[in-house]
Amino acid sequence: MFDAMTDAVTQDMSKILQTKAADLSGERLRNVEAALDATAQQIRGHWSAASDQAARSDFSVLHDGITAARNIVVHIASMR
């Protein structure tokens, strides 16, 4: 459903601190952030197309979770 969430991205997310330590350029965390951002945009599209309030509510909760995950990734990426 969310194409940006590839196996590589989800594996990097599951071990985010190890990913940060191994990725001196920061590219992998930027890829995770971009995937989460793209997924949030897709969710907004699904929310707009939802036909009932329950579905919109579900998509809102999902969007909030993805946005929180993105914020965590940004925070971890900025840690020294």
From Swiss-Prot:
InterPro entries xref list: HrpD6-like
Reported induction: Expression is controlled by the hrpD operon promoter phrpD51. Positively regulated by HrpX.
Effect of loss of the gene: Expression of hpa2, hpa1 and hpaB is undetectable in the mutant, and the expression levels of hrcC and hrcT are reduced. The mutant is deficient in secretion of Hpa2, Hpa1 and HpaB-dependent T3SS effectors, such as the TAL effector AvrXa27. Mutation also affects expression of several Xrp-coding genes.
Source taxon at top rank: Bacteria
Chain segments annotated as coiled-coil in the UniProt record: none
Function in brief: Involved in the regulation of several genes of the hrp-hrc-hpa cluster, which encodes a type III secretion system (T3SS). Upregulates the expression of hpa2, hpa1 and hpaB and partially controls the expression of hrcC and hrcT. Controls the secretion of the T3SS TAL effector AvrXa27. Also regulates the expression of several HrpX-regulated protein (Xrp) genes. Has no influence on hrpG or hrpX expression.
UniProt name for this protein: Regulatory protein HrpD6
Gene: hrpD6
